[in-house]
């Protein structure tokens, strides 16, 4: 287990909400692929937020393996997934039409794009997509079951003090994110 907090820097152009320099706290559990580690990280994070007086928030969770499996089920190729994820990560900024237009501009398979866009438009927003509907699409249900276990366990252990939700749009485009990802969203 490792915890560190310090100034970090982005090697990119600063933009709204993305400062070049900022303070970041990393909490890592190295060498374990157990969902217990993910649960511990979420509980540690929320305990720290509670300690500094943050009370009204929700935890959003996804899994890169699950997202990749969903994209492959629509017909995208393995070697296209990073590029598709980069585009999908822009959805809150450019909307579904913008995502579709960018995917078409990258000349991905039209049928894969149409299936993906139809799936997203049925739900209204990517945040409205239910884990069960994603799970039903997949041959390997392990990542979806892992997220279910994490959500159920955290909810039981915290007595529902805050909401823990599946969010397919939580993308994280950096290659070093390979499994479960989560973020906390303030509701204030």
How should each PLM-predicted stretch be described?
Residues 68, 90, 176:
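Short Asp/Glu-rich motifs
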Residues 59-70:
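Glycine-rich, mobile lid/loop segments that gate access to catalytic sites or pores
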Residues 2-55, 65, 99-188:
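Positively charged, Gly/Ser-enriched RNA/tRNA-binding surfaces
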Residues 60-61, 85, 167-168:
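A generic structural motif
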Residues 62, 76-79, 91-94, 108-111, ...:
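Short coil/turn linker and secondary-structure boundary residues
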Residues 75-101, 186:
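Acidic, His- and aromatic-enriched active-site or binding-groove loops in soluble protein domains
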Residues 1-3, 53-59, 78-82:
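Short secondary-structure capping/junction motifs at helix and strand boundaries
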């Amino acid at each position: 287990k490792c915890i560190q907090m310090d100034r970090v820097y982005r090697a990119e152009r600063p933009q709204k909400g993305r400062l070049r320099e900022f303070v970041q706290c990393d909490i890592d559990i190295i060498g374990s692929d157990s969902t217990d580690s993910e649960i511990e990280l979420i509980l540690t994070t929320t305990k720290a937020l509670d300690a500094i007086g943050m009370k009204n928030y929700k935890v959003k969770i996804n899994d890169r393996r699950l997202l990749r499996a969903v994209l492959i089920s629509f017909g995208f190729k393995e070697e296209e997934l990073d590029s598709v994820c980069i585009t999908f990560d822009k959805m809150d900024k450019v909307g579904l039409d913008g995502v579709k237009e960018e995917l078409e501009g990258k000349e991905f398979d039209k049928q894969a794009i149409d299936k993906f866009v139809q799936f997203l438009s049925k739900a209204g927003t990517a945040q409205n997509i239910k884990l069960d509907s994603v799970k039903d699409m997949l041959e390997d249900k392990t990542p979806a079951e892992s997220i279910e276990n994490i959500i159920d366990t955290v909810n039981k252990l915290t007595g529902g003090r805050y909401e823990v939700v599946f969010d397919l749009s939580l993308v994280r485009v950096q290659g070093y994110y390979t499994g479960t990802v989560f973020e906390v969203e303030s509701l204030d």
